[in-house]
Amino acid sequence: MRDRLFSIIYKYNLHPNRDLGQNFLIVPDIIERNIERAEVGEKDTVLEIGPGLGVLTDPLSKRAGKVYAIEKDCRIVEILRREYNWPNVEIIEGDALKVEWPEFNKMVSNLPYQISSPVTFKLLSREFERAVLIFQLEFAERMVAKPGDKNYSRLSLMVRAKARAELVERIGKGAFWPRPKVDSAVVVLEPKPPEERIDLNENLVKALFQHRRSTVSAALKKSAHMLGLSKDKARELRQVFSRVPHSERRVFQLSPEDVLEIEEFLKKEGVIESYPASP
């Protein structure tokens, strides 16, 4: 696999585009483990974002019934179409954040790091069975953080509201070419059953985590403008903010259930309306 990768690179005099986060995974064992973690079989339709030079796409094509690969770099798209003859792979040229995703039940990807967050939120808005994704290590650690952890963040809370996330493997820089500046990690995501998923007001979550180390009441007072409140209205509501559930707890200690309590209280008080739920 590694030899094939570098022969393609030399053949096309290819220089990875760092702006697109092109760091190609070159360790076959990691690729194989991720396919096994996803439990890919012939009945599965798999989505891959950022296929690069096909080192993951190729083995996926041998296991899955159908593979969709979304690639933004037109050079890479042309190379993939020339070098491989996959009868069950459809390459979609475009930006994964802008193109319409096809129907799929599993995702396996080595994601470009700069789009990790929006891709994750887009994924959580979809129905799927399992995703096995490679992220920057720091991002992965935030994704799986628990309430009260030092790196618990808006990302942690929003993932926790919709899915179960587990960091299953750390990957050193040497597993990629060119070597990235940071280590990476594999995260397995499985959506919670529909009855356990929590839809949260995204504006409220952003307002709270803008001041994640503040108390809940203090964070709301500081970020009232993010709820669409004028300065005068925010001053009027200071006493309401002091009475919210969990008012004296730090924001980074809140679970999705806690934030839902706060949201319901603020709706009853007429502070916020039923904005569209987050992904």
Swiss-Prot record:
GO MF, any single term: rRNA (adenine-N6,N6-)-dimethyltransferase activity
Domain of life: Archaea
Pfam families to which the protein is assigned, alphabetical: RrnaAD
Localization of this protein: Cytoplasm
Record-stated family: Belongs to the class I-like SAM-binding methyltransferase superfamily. rRNA adenine N(6)-methyltransferase family. RsmA subfamily.
Described function: Specifically dimethylates two adjacent adenosines in the loop of a conserved hairpin near the 3'-end of 16S rRNA in the 30S particle. May play a critical role in biogenesis of 30S subunits.
Protein name: Probable ribosomal RNA small subunit methyltransferase A
Species: Thermococcus kodakarensis (strain ATCC BAA-918 / JCM 12380 / KOD1) (Pyrococcus kodakaraensis (strain KOD1))
Gene designation: rsmA
